[in-house]
Every structure is written in structure tokens, then in C-alpha cells.
Regions:
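Gly/Ala-rich phosphate-binding loop of Rossmann-like dinucleotide-binding domains
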Residues: 16-21, 139-144, 231
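Glycine-rich Rossmann-fold phosphate-binding loop(s) that bind the pyrophosphate
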Residues: 10-11, 130-132, 219
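Residues that mark the start of a beta-strand
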Residues: 3, 25, 124-125, 148, ...
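Short glycine/serine/threonine-rich phosphate/pyrophosphate-binding segments
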Residues: 12-15, 109, 135-138
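A Rossmann-like FAD-binding core segment of flavoenzymes
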Residues: 52-98, 104-124, 144-229
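A conserved FAD-binding loop/helix module that cradles the flavin
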Residues: 136-138, 157-166, 238-263
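Glycine-rich FAD pyrophosphate-binding loop
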Residues: 22-38, 147-159
């Protein structure tokens, strides 16, 4: 059968490698200077080294399969159409969730992903706004590096979305490093040095102020904007990974594998 010319956008290593192994010509576009996307960032917190090993193994596999990798390339609809691909796999991932909260766009507030990537450097005393898995892993990393860390979370339990075994280890690390936990905290307003929040149990307003840095880690939302533009150009598009829904890495990898087998 005819070799299909496929294009994987924004670092979907698994789909690219498997598709190429199955005989397709694959171009992998990545806007960043390195492959790995959010998986690479996820490997930075304590105990997540095996994720980096997995990313490296997929990079090697893609290279051996003959995937053409183009780094530092912003995927624009017109440029993609000019390459005349038979299929396009869009894996643009997820972007930080920015809720309509007063002050959330304050320039002084750091993004969690930027902290993990080494693009932003928090001060000594840090407030993490958001205590899900990502926020807690950032808190754990900063605490191990010697920062004084406080985590404010809307839910009653921090890291409620983590696997139980991993959460237990995280809580032990929090206790060891003196990480302060503020649960049931619905953030109402951001300041450069902290937040105002409502206790969801009592309805009372409180402030957490006086921090050197505030790090935003309130979750992610699927980034599917590119696929919509490509579809309007009449290009066959498949959306995978966090571009469909922000979720666990294992789920995104399984989806990428299943798609690569079908194409």
C-alpha cells in the first residue's frame, strides 16, 4: 500500500515512532527546542526520574524509525497545508487553566510550568495556588531545594488526584520539609505577594500574604485550537493526548499507540 505522509504536531513521540515503524513517512513538529513536552516537565519533581528515561527511550525509538524531527517550529495551518500531508496528528497538549479571578493576570505571578522548566525562579518564601498533583509536585521540588512552601487548595485533601501510594510518599516529604497545607481554600483574589481566599467550610475570608513569590498551579485545559483551524482547511486531523483532555501520561500514551496502529 502507499506510504502515507503523516505529520505529528507538538511532540507526540509515541504516535510518530510507531507510525514510522509501520512504514509511514512522518514529520514531527515541535515548537520547543527539545522533545518531550509536558512529559519532560513532569520528570523534574522528586521521584519522577523514570519519566525522563521513558522520554529518552521514545526519542531514540523515533530516531531509529526515521522520523523527521523539526524543533523550534511553530505549526501554522498554512505552512502545514503546504506540506500536503495525508494525515495530521495534533498533540498540542494542554495549557494552564486561568480562571476568571481578580489579579490572576498579575505579571508577578509565576506559572507552574515555567518554574519546572527553569524559566521562572521563585523567591525563598513561596505560595503555590493549587494543590492538585502538579501543584504539590512543584511544592515538593521547591521544598527539597530549600524554599519555604505553602500550598492553598480548593479541595479538602491536597494531591487528591494522585495514586494513593505516591500521595503517601508526598505527604511524608511534606512533613519532613515543613510544607504548610491550606485546604478548603477558594481563592477569590490574587496579589503580587499572596491571595485572598474563602474557607469553603465556614464561608469566612482570609488572606495569605507576605510571600516572595506566588506560583499558579490550578490545573490545565485541553489546547485544541490548532486542530479546529486545520479542519477548516480540509485537512484530515486526529487529536490525541492532552489536546483532547488533560489527563495522566499513561492514558495519552495508550491513545497515541492505538491511533498509530489504526492509521
Amino acid at each position: 500500500s502507499r506510504r502515507q505522509r503523516q505529520m505529528c504536531i507538538r511532540d507526540r513521540l509515541a504516535a510518530a515512532a510507531i507510525s514510522s515503524e509501520r512504514g509511514h513517512d512522518v514529520i514531527l513538529l515541535e515548537e520547543a527546542p527539545a522533545l518531550g513536552g509536558n512529559m519532560r516537565l513532569a520528570s523534574f519533581p522528586p521521584g519522577k526520574g523514570p519519566i525522563a528515561d521513558m522520554v529518552r527511550s521514545w526519542v531514540v525509538r523515533a530516531q531509529k524509525a526515521g522520523v523527521e524531527v523539526r524543533l523550534g517550529v511553530k505549526a501554522l495551518p498554512d505552512d502545514i497545508a503546504a506540506l500536503q500531508p495525508d494525515e495530521v496528528v495534533v498533540a498540542t497538549g494542554a495549557r494552564a487553566l486561568l480562571l476568571p479571578i481578580e489579579g490572576i493576570d498579575c505579571p508577578a505571578i509565576l506559572r507552574g510550568g515555567d518554574v519546572l522548566a527553569g524559566k521562572a525562579y521563585p523567591g525563598k518564601n513561596v505560595l503555590i495556588a493549587g494543590g492538585g498533583m502538579v501543584g504539590c509536585e512543584i511544592a515538593d521540588l521547591l521544598a527539597e531545594l530549600g524554599h519555604s512552601v505553602t500550598v492553598a487548595e480548593y479541595r479538602e485533601n491536597l494531591a487528591a488526584d494522585m495514586v494513593a501510594e505516591h500521595r503517601s510518599a508526598l505527604m511524608r516529604s511534606f512533613a519532613e520539609h515543613g510544607v504548610c497545607q491550606v485546604p478548603n481554600a477558594k481563592i477569590c483574589r490574587f496579589y503580587a505577594d499572596g491571595v485572598e481566599y474563602e474557607n469553603t467550610l465556614t464561608g469566612q475570608l482570609h488572606e495569605l500574604r507576605g510571600f516572595d513569590s506566588v506560583v499558579l498551579a490550578m490545573g490545565y485545559v485541553a489546547d485544541d485550537r490548532l486542530s479546529e483551524a486545520l479542519a477548516q482547511c480540509g485537512i484530515s486531523v486526529h487529536v490525541v493526548g492532552d489536546a483532547v483532555k488533560a489527563r495522566r501520561a499513561i492514558d495519552a500514551l495508550r491513545e497515541a499507540y492505538e491511533l498509530a496502529v489504526l492509521l
